[in-house]
Amino acid sequence: MRILLAAAECAPMIKVGGMGDVVGSLPPSLIKLGHDVRVIIPGYGKLWSLLEVSNEPVFRANTMGTDFAVYEAKHPIHNYVIYLVGHPIFDSDQIYGGENEDWRFTFFASATSEFAWNCWKPQVLHCHDWHTGMIPVWMHQDPEISTVFTIHNLKYQGPWRWKLEKMTWCPWYMHGDHTMAAAMLYADRVNAVSPTYADEIKTHEYGESLEGLLNYISGKLRGILNGIDLDEWNPAKDPVLPAKFSINNLKNRTENKKILQREMGLEVNPKKYLLGMVSRLVDQKGVDLLLQVSRRLLAYTDSQIAVLGTGDRYLESGLWQLALDYPGRFSVFLTYDDSLSRLIYGGSDAFLMPSRFEPCGISQLLAMRYGSVPIVRRVGGLVDTVLPHDPENNSGTGFCFDRFEPIDFYTSLVRSWEAFRHKDSWELLQKRAMSQEFSWQRSALEYEMMYKDVCGIKEPSPDVAEVEKFSYGQSADPSLKKG
């Protein structure tokens, strides 16, 4: 099959979250299955120097009242074809935000549609999050191109329909209050990035006011778990790790722990229980829970905590204050550093993910791969990937809690600290975590099944009367509804 992935990110060149990992790492696994897979992304400023880009465009056109050109490049690691949409609107390296964000990504979706119609025509056009949400709408009446829409994070839903109507051509048949809703209605298949998240978003608690619509389309909705690149993330070969190790040789891991402690200003003592966190510092990731339990944990146990990331100012300030109050025991680096993140995965004893919601999560997969035992809230993809530790039966791969409450998180932390003191059983727990297999090849087989299922098929137009029931979401203010 000819498959084109359209997205705002593609790792490692352009990456903010998990979407970048999916778009960057899924194509090689699909190519191994015999498919012609290519990616199209905006031509952000730095890409022109990072990649070897064709001198001449492969396609020129006009859309939304402005000219654009598409250039061909190759992925720097996997060597598959990447198309860059060239236009001055993408010249900066800013991916998200800004006053023109809605226009920027609607234009990208429109340019991608023109390219797919008139240059390289795929059988399946795989769209990712609201940034490409208009593509399934425009492709709806093209019988030769089937569309798949992946929900990475339902919270971000794109511009409202009235704004889209001002910016660009909206088909007469279009329904859905905003880009995300329209994409889900008109895509031929929809998937979330884990089976549990696919179920959760059909409920009021996690549906972001789209639960009614998601139940309406549930027949074409499924969950496919993300994976990781096992070659790129291999503690036995990772060039960044000072000490390489494997599931059969964990002794070297202690050296990484000591170096991590030194680099982050913690007391260098491998006997201390070291908790790591690599995350965007936002409410979704449960950083506020960490702020609420850290003082009590540090008072009761001899634990150390190392945090790496950036995010909301008030959360950064809270973490910084803890570092000032507990020197040598609590450390935070308010930046993102790939080398340091790998050292946290490969040197910490346990890894923190107390998320409010988690569509899939990549960090817990990396942590387990590198022998850092995950401590997670049982939500979204964390349910599908982390098995609760059961000391009586010597089973499980991490520590789990259910409610988003400080006491529940704290209890899991203390349980893990107590387990850490029993070195033999802790090493068995580490090895069970490291033995889990979350490769992209497994995920690619599921995507291939979905592509084959949808190839050459167009879903019927949505029932207008049914769609109107979900307009503006079940929890929205009815007074906002347009006539």
Curated annotation (Swiss-Prot):
Disulfide bonds: none annotated. It catalyses: [(1->4)-alpha-D-glucosyl](n) + ADP-alpha-D-glucose = [(1->4)-alpha-D-glucosyl](n+1) + ADP + H(+). Its EC number is 2.4.1.21. The keyword Oxidoreductase does not apply. It is an enzyme of class 2 (transferase). It holds the Pfam family Glyco_transf_5. It comes from the Bacteria. Pathway: Glycan biosynthesis; glycogen biosynthesis. ADP-alpha-D-glucose binds at residue 15. GO terms for biological process: glycogen biosynthetic process. Keywords: Glycogen biosynthesis, Glycosyltransferase, Transferase. Gene3D superfamilies: Glycogen Phosphorylase B (3.40.50.2000). This is Glycogen synthase. The lineage of its organism: Bacteria, Bacillati, Cyanobacteriota, Cyanophyceae, Synechococcales. The gene is glgA.
